């Protein structure tokens, strides 16, 4: 609502799609894409946690490239730089801004998105540098009023990502240092806000 109020104040036309649930579905993304095609935005602002940002990334892809085969984009591979399918270039129709309200997934600064096809039950992972948001606005004020349960879950998500990075086959001395420091930060500071006991 504060973002919409500011856009109104500036005289910027806008519309809002707020039907994204946790673990977003392809069907939900298609519904949001239909709204985009009707409104024709030149900027997409994704506000929320990882689910909202992932869904918005998928909507962005389908808005910019309606003819691309979704199953081709979601192929399995080990290295993001060694894809068989060439991911379509993004940003011709709309600029993408990510505004996180939780810090668990890091979707605002990663080239990944996950979406579930409700009809088949398949969870599609998409990974390509074209999915990187053009801008990320990370404002801690957006997170200070979050429920403790969400903050706990986000903190554990941060730790999980750090452990995955540390155990990755593609880990290096550089990434190990970042991963270990992320784990240390979770242990040092998560309990301060949540009163959660970490061993």
Please provide the spans of the model-predicted regions.
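Hydrophobic packing residues within well-ordered alpha-helices of enzyme cores
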Residues: 3, 56-59, 186
């Amino acid at each position: 609502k504060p973002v919409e109020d500011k856009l109104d104040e500036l005289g910027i036309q806008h519309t809002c799609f707020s039907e994204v649930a946790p673990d977003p579905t392809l069907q939900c993304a298609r519904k949001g894409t239909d709204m985009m095609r009707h409104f024709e935005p030149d900027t997409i602002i994704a506000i929320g946690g990882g689910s909202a940002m992932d869904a918005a990334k998928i909507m962005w892809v389908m808005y910019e490239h309606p003819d691309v085969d979704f199953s081709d984009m979601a192929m399995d591979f080990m290295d993001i730089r060694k894809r068989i399918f060439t991911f379509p270039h993004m940003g011709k129709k709309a600029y993408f801004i990510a505004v996180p309200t939780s810090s668990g997934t890091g979707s605002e600064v990663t080239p990944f998105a996950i979406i579930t096809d409700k009809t088949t039950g398949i969870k599609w992972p998409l990974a390509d540098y074209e999915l990187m948001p053009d801008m990320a606005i990370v404002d801690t004020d957006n997170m200070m009023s979050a429920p403790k349960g969400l903050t706990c879950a986000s903190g554990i998500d941060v730790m999980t990502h750090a452990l995955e990075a540390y155990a990755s086959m593609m880990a290096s001395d550089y990434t190990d240092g970042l991963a270990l420091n992320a784990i240390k930060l979770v242990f040092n500071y998560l309990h301060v806000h949540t009163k959660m006991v970490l061993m």
